[in-house]
């Protein structure tokens, strides 16, 4: 190979190695010794240079090139095997300056060639050079023995930077390492320039490789492929990977005979993990909150805390570094993990607290010595470095002496000789350096008694002041100067001895005196005396410093010889610090030791999240975990939103991680098999710079799990597939699970999957007996509020309670109501595109103007009726009572006026039913109220008002007014069916703006009296206060006839019911066609419809009476009078009218237009998620009184939602209304609080009439009734019913439960061994039993037929296959 390559370059005229960029120019590999460069040892003589010479088989070998990159304490690598043409990469791992993992990596790979960046850490280069390239020397000026290097960064010189003793020791260690290696040639080191390892160049090379098979790919596409296939966060791995590819391109390894366009063959790229390490990527670290974020504030106050911050109780710097290293590199070495667990157990015990506290105190004095050793090496160590060294070494010795006396001494093996040597170094350093004097002198000084010569010099220097004073006196006398003339002999370092004389002294007169310099006070001169002192003492201070420096250098040399021993003790101390931290955390939080086993199982009892338990405001609920037992390794978790699925799965991941770093786990008991990697799809790191969508990142993480997960891996997936279409997400998730489950229990990883795709069990192979289903228990409190218990239980649910979560988070009720209706439509099988849209109040004006067309279009009218029946709103408009007092007086005066004036007033009222203010409270409007148009106020005469009236389809035609009726019914031709639907839905947006204690004029019930029998019927008040007018007129002849048939009724009594709307009191618009046609159309439409209904009662309305004042009560009495005499009630109060007359439309039993003539005190009407309210219609108990009030029992009325309103058992024709006197008398007290569960109204029976509020099913009476009727059973939670129970209520506490049930949790039957589902699929799903009723058989048939049908990809919200299993068995 090398022959062809050299031959090619020589023919080009390039004398340098490698492919040149032109004649006479080399490449960046000029200074690199390429492999087998000795093939041309014979040179070019005899033409051998240009001939193909056979290679010596002994010299030939396949190359294994290892590329290394080390920076910021992280090591990345990649290597290429020429024999197999495989390229393998290793993600970044944490590495210290001992390079233990680097040694293990080289031993495992056994490379023949190592390439490294010569500009990286000097310790890294030194480690490689001393072992794999000891001959080559790189000097500090950037030159080598072969010439000048292209790299201008100063690099390390092993011969100059270290002492001879240390170099010899390293050479000996290298020889020992070589002896341990297998047979074969040693690896050769090539130091490449820094541009080979640049990140940008590596990315470009990877892009070129990714787009080699498709030239049409853009740069963005190539980058996305790289992002999805490689971990870009592993910077050192990417750098080494790119450098390796560039090196292969430069050397053309394996393709020397091919054209230049051919690159080195790479069959596959794989990721490898260093032995005994658990692979964990960056996304998993972030998802499980293992390490803190780089930008995270230190003061988190419990929010955003990481596991590392929780576990960091280390007292030393080396301990913190060791803890981070363990977190970066969890191990699979079971012996090492068991050893750590023993130490943690020892430090956790209370009886070892004294030893633990002592060790922690000493560890606080241990410092990192890497920088200290560098200062020692460069000779720039100062006093602070020596203090740090001596303090640390003494602390290390003390710690090891304590550990050797404990039962865990075997876990920290230290040779006695090594400990003795380090102890000697500490003693020697402490006894040589005088730290007290050094602080005064500002330099390192040596103690007395270390060196005799040094002691003599020090004594001489200390006695020098007395000597110089005596000499100064002698010179003063010799020079003839007067006493006290300031003559002095001075010693100046580096200058010597000088004589100081007064300035007026004549230096020129003395021939042996030389002037050196002068000051403003004296002259400094030299003479024979100073020269004699220089000869005798010399520069004594410098001699003293030099002597001390020589001793310190000797001490430094001896310390550096013991550097490795000291570093080893530092490593032991760091491990002790981390294990003490683990023990303190375990004792503080009550963690326990996990049992490490070889079998692939993950089991735990009372497991909880260690971080969430610290920040949660209430007690945390632990759960159990089981995976791998009996071959079940896939746990599919479903349940409501915000029930704790993600926290549960994170707890599992953290438990497994903690067990692989030797820590205790937050569980009572745990059994964990060793895992080789932890892969998650929980956390998505979004960035606008990477060009990838959120779903693409999710797919990237799942793809990583599919590529790397083995039978001993842990895979955690949280709601994968939610970032795209439901069908596509479900398909991908089902395919991923099928892929793993088909591999079998041995090769399938431990999978913990949470999803809201409730149809997932239908698309995975349950027959493999690998999957199990889990869910969380919830309670339904009063008012339909969901209470999460966060308790795991086996089972599978088909609802997520997303609407409840949305309500709790403040989503407006109209939005939730619309979502609930869409959900019910989808659950009923309606396609999403078939669900009609709804509009807001923005186009209300236009819709009101078009309402006349509705009554002309019968189909549109029927569709509007259906839309109204499905509405579930119960709020009231407080503003409707502002002008009610004036309207009442006006209506009373109009009651005795001629019929023509009454009709005109009623006509004016009907035009203003849906005013702007009445639209703010459209809760429980009657069907025709919702359809009547809203007209602007106009000051017109009665005839003009009548001309604009819309037809009344239920109006009883009077012979005397027939002509007038025909005159005002002018149908409009253009259709407005879409507007009808929008208008009906638009009313529901105003459900929550009404006051809690508002009054409704529709809550009044008027009992006819003899006085009123001959008078005109009362009118029903509109909701609006802005436009108020009398109600619709009825046939005077019919009303008079009915009144005459009830002569025994006493004076009018006003009945005020709890605040509850009776929807049966409708206005009566006229149809543009005949009455029979209308009746047949309504009957046919309602017989075909089967709306989903949930009976709801407004408990707040039952307390409205206590807020009423005498004035309001009088107004309510008038309203009751006005709301009573509608044509429907008139028909029912007549003896001549057939009791079945009002039911002639044949509406469904739960329709609000059908009279409820049945009362069964033992049956509580209800609804489920799949069926409407179906009361048993029977006329055996019907009575005339029941006929009058039966229409009050609607789906929104208390008389039908919980308890039907009974008729008079005596069958009397004219009921005595005096029975209500006591009730109305009690309601006068405005401050009296009415309990919703106590008697607040009379209901008619054989003895007396008592109106009673509905009793919840939790009461003893209801329980006994259900028991007698055989209806007591478990209840399933209907999400739609649950949400509808809260839509219109501002106060949750006062909201009744939609179905009157006790707060329940999910109930599951015991698994039946004979059940074919469990026998074949082994899926532990829950059993939701519906409340038993006469319609259960119908529902069972529906469920069976639904489950037998072929599944589709649309949203599947049906119950799972195990529903009602007890009945089948």
Curated annotation (Swiss-Prot):
Biased composition, Basic and acidic residues: where in the chain? 884-894, 1073-1084, 1254-1263
Stretches of Polar residues bias are at: 895-915, 941-950, 991-1003, 1049-1065, 1111-1124, 1153-1167
Q: Identify the tissues in which this protein is expressed.
A: Expressed in the germline.
State the UniProt keywords alphabetically.
ATP-binding, Chromosome, DNA-binding, Meiosis, Nucleotide-binding
One of the record's GO cellular component terms: nucleus
Q: Looking at the keywords, is Lipid biosynthesis present?
A: no
Q: What is its main location?
A: nucleus
Per its UniProt record, what PROSITE patterns does this chain match?
Answer: DNA_MISMATCH_REPAIR_2 (PS00486)
Q: Where is the composition biased (Low complexity)?
A: 1024-1037
Q: What does this protein do?
A: Crucial component in meiotic recombination, functioning at some point after the initiation step of recombination. Plays a role in promoting the crossover outcome of meiotic recombination events. Required for formation of normal meiotic crossover, and crossover and chiasmata generated by artificially made DNA breaks. Together with him-14 and zhp-3 plays a role in the activation of DNA damage-dependent apoptosis at the DNA damage checkpoint in pachytene cells.
Concerning its family, UniProt says: Belongs to the DNA mismatch repair MutS family.
- Would you tell me the protein name for this molecule? MutS protein homolog 5
Organism, scientific name: Caenorhabditis elegans
